[in-house]
Amino acid sequence: MIFIPTNGTTFLLLDGQPAVFSAVAQKLYALNTEAALIWCGFEEGEPASSVVDRLVASGVSPTDAATYVNQAARKWVRLGLLQVHIASFDGLATECAFTVSLGRSTWTFEFNGESVAQSVLQLFEHHEPPLESGNRLKIIEAKGLVYVFDNDRCVLTCAMDDVVPSIKAYLTEQLVSQCAPDIAFHAACLEHNAKALLISGDPGAGKTTLALYLVQHGRLACCADDIVLIRSDGTVTGVPFAPTIKSGAWRILEEFIPDLEDVPVHRRPDGKRVKYLNALAMVRNGSVYPVGGIVFLRRRSRGDAKLVPLRRLDVLKRVITGSYSPNRRMSHASLIAFKNMLTQADLFELSYSNVAEAGAAILGMYDGKS
């Protein structure tokens, strides 16, 4: 394996004391003599086996040298000081590839193994043959770990159990950072009669659970369960990841989605267990709709479901709080987009304790509407 320093990482000597500084973490790490030898070997592009030989030449036993190099590499990768170089996998052929469209961007995935590809496909309902243009991720499984390269730069190293949630988290981060001129809004997006219904709320408020209930019990189609892109004219488009279902909602949803029981379980970076439902007949990427309604969820431990109308100014504040732009600032153009989005929308807060009652309250908004 070949490791190289990450961008912004610098080796230095201070009064003879070797150290490494990370500009990203804003931390300084002191190194002992053996660690300094190991670091310099990696910095010079040597493979791990050659770094072990360098340590042995300094007087360390072969067994100890191999242990030191392995432990140092793992620790420095975890700290973000080192990254795996793609040259470590020269000679590995691409066995399968596909492209997905997310918002305004396309992502092509290349794999050296079919099993990882099938796991990652759980994130998407629609995919196409690989394209030559657009963003490209190379996903390599080796010795029980999965390495993800974006433009030949290692951006993720994780276990097989973590690869699907980790890739979704990375893609989400990239989509938000590249979404200009659109604005990313944290909400589920459903389509009814060529208009969008946005369902927003704090983490754990039940956006995905309620959205899936509405899809199964109403005439609504799912566009997205967590990311909506707001365009300059106020129309929106959902980012069509397969809905992420947390473990607390499995029992509720299995009552009307029986196949959910057989969907594989994944572990997110935050430790939560999730399933991805990619058999929902989701709206295809790029479908754009005016917003017909926005519902903000307020989950309670008890009490009947209740819809309360909201003023547009109050909703604007909430939308600003739940939105993200590449420069992390809302501009005049952003405010105009929000205003355009809210102009013709029905705006409510929904307090509820029972998903079925909440779903009935929202479906009641459409009674009498075609």
Q: Where does each model-flagged region fall?
A:
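Post-Walker A alpha-helix
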Residues: 210-211
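Long, charge-rich, low-complexity alpha-helical segments
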Residues: 24-98, 102-103
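Glycine-rich, often acidic-flanked micro-motifs
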Residues: 14, 49, 188, 192-201, ...
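Acidic, low-complexity/disordered tracts enriched in E/D and polar residues
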Residues: 1-36, 40
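Pre-Walker A adenine-sensing motif
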Residues: 177-192
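Charged, amphipathic alpha-helical linker segments immediately N-terminal to NTP-binding catalytic cores
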Residues: 126, 130-176, 364-369
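Transition-metal
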Residues: 85-142
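Conserved lysine of the Walker
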Residues: 207
